[in-house]
Amino acid sequence: MPPKGWRKDSEGNYPNTSYIKEQEKISIDDLLFPKSIITSLAKESLQNAFQKGEEERRITVSKDAALAMQRSATVFVNHLLMFARMNAKDSNRKSCNDQDIMAALDTLGLGALESILTGKMQEYQEAILWKKQNKVNNAVPGADGDIAMEDDEDDEDDDGREGADADAEPKSRADTEVQQGNAENDKLDGPPVNQEQVPSTRQNDLDLSTKKQKTE
């Protein structure tokens, strides 16, 4: 049994839920576009109407003018959408595309707006493509030249290593000569030769030679 308060229709049947929803009153206030967007679009169109070189003027839109544009824009778009849906239905499609909108403009006698609408659509698609490319570039590491910087750093590291190897070559040669001298002294059961002691041994030889000359 339906809830209390529901009445039968003219045929004597209780209304179902879908029937009640269809009977609900929908006013234009429920379909209005945001007033801020409509006002900003109106100001932008007025700014573009000014000639180049003129000073920018501050444009103000009154409350009544904003309400009138809001209502008229809502009525126009819904009226245009009705004809676009009819074209889509004739083509056995459930959704409308841009071609349906263009055909609806021709039906309403507003074919002159097709070129303007086409240009705006191209600008919108280019803006979307530009945003996608920026997202891809920001997501890929090294897309802004980081790879080149890393290559430069690697080259600098290689140059530094080569310089360090070149400086180490003379030291390694001196060390090998000292080690060879120590090995020969070890064979003769003598003390190991140190590089720092080389000048002192030469001085001792000179002292011995002078002593021999004096004794003679």
Swiss-Prot record:
Cellular component per GO, a single term: CHRAC
GO BP: DNA damage response; heterochromatin formation; leading strand elongation
Chain spans, region Disordered: 139-216
Swiss-Prot/TrEMBL keywords: DNA replication, Nucleus
Residue spans of biased composition, Acidic residues class: 147-160
Primary location group: nucleus
Biased amino acid composition, Basic and acidic residues: 161-176, 204-216
An example molecular function term from Gene Ontology annotations: chromatin DNA binding
InterPro entries registered for this protein in UniProt: DNA_Pol-Epsilon_Subunit, Histone-fold
Record Gene3D superfamilies: Histone, subunit A
Compartment annotation: Nucleus
Bias type Polar residues, positions: 194-203
Function recorded in the entry: As accessory component of the DNA polymerase epsilon (DNA polymerase II) participates in chromosomal DNA replication.
Note: In eukaryotes there are five DNA polymerases: alpha, beta, gamma, delta, and epsilon which are responsible for different reactions of DNA synthesis.
PANTHER family: DNA POLYMERASE EPSILON SUBUNIT 3
Quaternary assembly: Heterotetramer. Consists of four subunits: POL2, DPB2, DPB3 and DPB4.
Designated name of the protein: DNA polymerase epsilon subunit D
Protein source organism: Kluyveromyces lactis (strain ATCC 8585 / CBS 2359 / DSM 70799 / NBRC 1267 / NRRL Y-1140 / WM37)
Taxon lineage: Eukaryota, Fungi, Dikarya, Ascomycota, Saccharomycotina
